[in-house]
Amino acid sequence: MGKIIGIDLGTTNSCVAIMDGTTARVLENAEGDRTTPSIIAYTQDGETLVGQPAKRQAVTNPQNTLFAIKRLIGRRFQDEEVQRDEAIMPYKIIGADNGDAWIDVKGQKMAPPQISAEVLKKMKKTAEDYLGEPVTEAVITVPAYFNDAQRQATKDAGRIAGLEVKRIINEPTAAALAYGLDKEVGNRTIAVYDLGGGTFDISIIEIDEVDGEKTFEVLATNGDTHLGGEDFDSRMINYLVDEFKKDQGIDLRNDPLAMQRLKEAAEKAKIELSSAQQTDVNLPYITADASGPKHMNIKVTRAKLESLVEDLVNRSIEPLKVALQDAGLSVSDIQDVILVGGQTRMPMVQKKVAEFFGKEPRKDVNPDEAVAIGAAVQGGVLTGEVKDVLLLDVTPLSLGIETMGGVMTALISKNTTIPTKHSQVFSTAEDNQSAVTIHVLQGERKRAADNKDLGQFNLDGISPAPRGMPQIEVTFDIDADGILHVSAKDKNSGKEQKITIKASSGLNEEEIQKMVREAEANAESDRKFEELVQTRNQGDHLLHSTRKQVEEAGDQLPADDKTAIETALSALETSLKGEDKADIEAKMQELAQASQKLMEIAQQQHAQQQAGAAGADASQNHAKDDDVVDAEFEEVKDKK
């Protein structure tokens, strides 16, 4: 059985890990980094860049450099959070035909799973380069508070990237696995506070050890899938823009290039203020007006940053209270607090968490790598490499159906351990009703319309009967990935209808297959592009070396040969500007044939140089020998 890799598909950064024996290993990417920016860029010449190369060119290509795509995955365009992002993102968020949030890249509509697949492909390639073999299976992490549509969209991204997603695992649970697996922790209850680039989760997890087997049981989870480091960056960006406007009277929001530079500077300043009390945001030539170029130089203190984001940090505290309440625990029952996600490096976040739990968070868990390590451990559990580990996760939100009067009736309550199955019998609302619509919902509100619509389906062929008489059994079945399967059965006629919940949004099978084919075609075109570049480099080298040899040959090269070589050189030079690999190879071959006489001359010159060098060495050695005097010696016997 091949390796199942663990991938933390993050909003800001992603990370990949594998099991190496009984320990998890985080893998370095092609740039030598252990984490990869979740940034994808589509360049003018049709190339797709992922990670650091994409980040480096963002300033010159802001509209086609996509970041924080995870905030859009599985979401509707009309969602309030999407509308907020649409107003501030340099790239164009649009509504797809099915109502989902998609992105317009150079006039082409692209789905978030399709874009996220590019990051997953890089993670896959990183693992393949390390292992030296193809990788086809993965465990991918998602925020614990992701709903069904977001989980399904993440699985779709994996498929488009050529990965069979063996399991979707919640990020805080993965971090708990990373923390608890290699430590003799005994029985403990821990809180995992996960504040990443775009999402926030809190999970209360119980670790039990019985006869060498460790059980990780999630007692409760809560969160906010639109709260993270990107929001902290936005506050800093808005502050800098407002300060610059006050000072210079120019609003930088209308300048995508300036805003991209500002985004990078704001993120850098935020990070610096985790270790320093103040920093300078210094951006020369940020813009210009009739009076000339304008420079930005603004001093930002840690206190200022904290005042800008205090409400964001406070927003993370309410879910902590709810999670503890749902778990039936108090703060004193928590033995360890683990911080996950880059934004938890901010001293203010650490202080607030310590104040809430009444204890300092642990510092021995790497906030950037713990989640990928946990995903790799789960992969090891699935392959049998990791034994004696049992993971019991929960569904983050209640699941139910709409019943008479527009009410949501829950069949599975939030924080129920998964996988799970639950059935309930419902009836008709009208006399002789022959069909019912099963409207599936996810959320905690009583009014059906206030919850997340996961989709609907019809059960037809119900036997005519007075209202309230037919018995329709609705069964909800949640798998280990937290994805819902629903069936409805008329107990009288035996008619049954089943669906795996694919939200009314989401990608259909045909769209996924199309994107898989496109991804495979891209892989082929990437390979061809790489081969073309290699051939071009060989051609360039041949041009340079041939010209040098013509120069060195001088008058020894007959005029006819020289003319033929010049013609072949010119033809190769023209061919190198094109995209035809076969033509470049043909022109290189023609140049090689035209240069046969030149090669002979070059070889003769080389042989003469060698002979000359050897002669010089010999005469030098002879001269040295003339200076040598044979020593006369006689044996001196020791006197005894």
From Swiss-Prot:
Pfam families on file: HSP70
UniProt-listed Gene3D superfamilies: 1.20.1270.10, 3.30.420.40, Actin, Chain A, domain 4, Substrate Binding Domain Of DNAk, Chain A, domain 1
Up-regulation conditions: By stress conditions e.g. heat shock.
Region (Disordered): 600-640
Low complexity: bias regions: 602-620
CDD domains, sorted: ASKHA_NBD_HSP70_DnaK-like
Modified residues (Phosphothreonine): 199
Keywords annotated in UniProt: ATP-binding, Chaperone, Nucleotide-binding, Phosphoprotein, Stress response
Single annotated GO MF: ATP-dependent protein folding chaperone
Family (UniProt): Belongs to the heat shock protein 70 family.
UniProt-listed HAMAP family: DnaK (MF_00332)
NCBIfam families, per the entry: PRK00290.1 (NF001413), PRK05183.1 (NF003520), prok_dnaK (TIGR02350)
Purpose of the protein: Acts as a chaperone.
Protein name: Chaperone protein DnaK
Source species: Enterobacter sp. (strain 638)
Gene: dnaK
